[in-house]
Amino acid sequence: MLVDKLYALSLSHKRLSVDELSEISRNVHKTCYNVQAFVFHTCNRVEVYLYDADAGPAEHIKRSYGPYVEKVAEFRGVEAARHLFRVAAGLESMLIGETDVLGQLEEAYESQVRRGNLRGLLKTVVERAVAVGKRVRTETGISRGPRGLGSLSIVYLSRRLPLREISVCVIGAGAVGRGVVKELIDAGVRRVAVVNRTVEKAADLGVEVRPLTSENVEWCLREFDVVYTAVSSFEPVVVYVPPGSRVKLVVDLGVPRNTAPNLPVEVVTLDHLRELAEEFNRQRAEEVSKAEKIVEEEVARLEEVLRRRWVELEMSALLKKWFAVAEEEGERAGGGPARLAAMSTVKRTLLPLVNYIKEVAVKDLAVAEGLLQVLKSAYA
């Protein structure tokens, strides 16, 4: 089975603290930078997914988890797919059903496709995971209440400070930061501002926006009661607090942590939110079984999806060549209508053949492999 070639490594909030996860994230990213792999790193997990990888590279990546390598969970085949689908569905999150993880998954997918690290059938697996996450949140009520760790932190904040009387600055306007800003506004916070690397990306939020500089980080600390950090950075964003600053609380949602140790102000991290998350997890217990049923349905379908995609990938080079030949012959015959007719003939002849081989692959992968080999030998 094609899904059998999938392999995953995972360390999450279930085995390590946020600070410990932050320790290993840089090394894992560095190890995987030029590798065909999908790295999914949030404040609650550091995971790597590989497809059809040799044992040597896989073991090398596993060792990049450093002092925590013995705590790494390994998943293979269907279990690896099931784990990724559960992560996308929010079933493995500290706050069950949270939506931030889905946005982060999409961001990781897009960036790694652009970089060229994610392609082939591994890309298809991640695409299916995103689709599963969306389906779970559409068909169940698992995300009712706080929709993410950002919104959970606002509940925490509301139990500490009067929201309508405070000012909040959010550093970072990615998926998590944007969600926090919108919920702060909805909660009636007196003043909200954003500091972000690109001002344009946060312009639509309808609040004051400044570029991410050390001066503007200081401005946040001096002028606001609460500062959120939600930046993807391997270096701390808040390294010191200027004397006389107004800030009472820093909420660090960064990946990894955005705050330097031993700051002279209270820093709230995700570890502080565990008890509150459990409170809402108990309320969502009934929806968990519905979400798990959807995950199992999608896991059962994955092999068929992979086989169809495998045929497309195997045939793509041949199709490209055949279309090029048809275009060339059409130009020789006078171009224009002749070229279009030649291209149309290729489509009418070959696309049904591709679809036929897809159906064969679903039933018998070995037979489909034989058909593809015949085509490659005859026409390559």
Swiss-Prot record:
GO terms for biological process: protoporphyrinogen IX biosynthetic process from glutamate. Substrate binds at residues 42-45, 93, 98-100, 104. InterPro entries: 4pyrrol_synth_GluRdtase, 4pyrrol_synth_GluRdtase_N, GluRdtase_CS, GluRdtase_N_sf, NAD(P)-bd_dom_sf, Shikm_DH/Glu-tRNA_Rdtase. GO terms for molecular function: glutamyl-tRNA reductase activity; NADP binding. It catalyses: (S)-4-amino-5-oxopentanoate + tRNA(Glu) + NADP(+) = L-glutamyl-tRNA(Glu) + NADPH + H(+). Pathway: Porphyrin-containing compound metabolism; protoporphyrin-IX biosynthesis; 5-aminolevulinate from L-glutamyl-tRNA(Glu): step 1/2. The active site is at 43 (nucleophile). Keywords: NADP, Oxidoreductase, Porphyrin biosynthesis. Its EC number is 1.2.1.70. NADP(+) binds at residues 172-177. The keyword Glycosyltransferase does not apply. PROSITE patterns: GLUTR (PS00747). The record marks 83 as: Important for activity. It holds the Pfam family Shikimate_DH. It is an enzyme of class 1 (oxidoreductase). Belongs to the glutamyl-tRNA reductase family. During catalysis, the active site Cys acts as a nucleophile attacking the alpha-carbonyl group of tRNA-bound glutamate with the formation of a thioester intermediate between enzyme and glutamate, and the concomitant release of tRNA(Glu). The thioester intermediate is finally reduced by direct hydride transfer from NADPH, to form the product GSA. Catalyzes the NADPH-dependent reduction of glutamyl-tRNA(Glu) to glutamate 1-semialdehyde (GSA). Possesses an unusual extended V-shaped dimeric structure with each monomer consisting of three distinct domains arranged along a curved 'spinal' alpha-helix. The N-terminal catalytic domain specifically recognizes the glutamate moiety of the substrate. The second domain is the NADPH-binding domain, and the third C-terminal domain is responsible for dimerization. Homodimer. This is Glutamyl-tRNA reductase 1. The lineage of its organism: Archaea, Thermoproteota, Thermoprotei, Thermoproteales, Thermoproteaceae. The gene is hemA1.
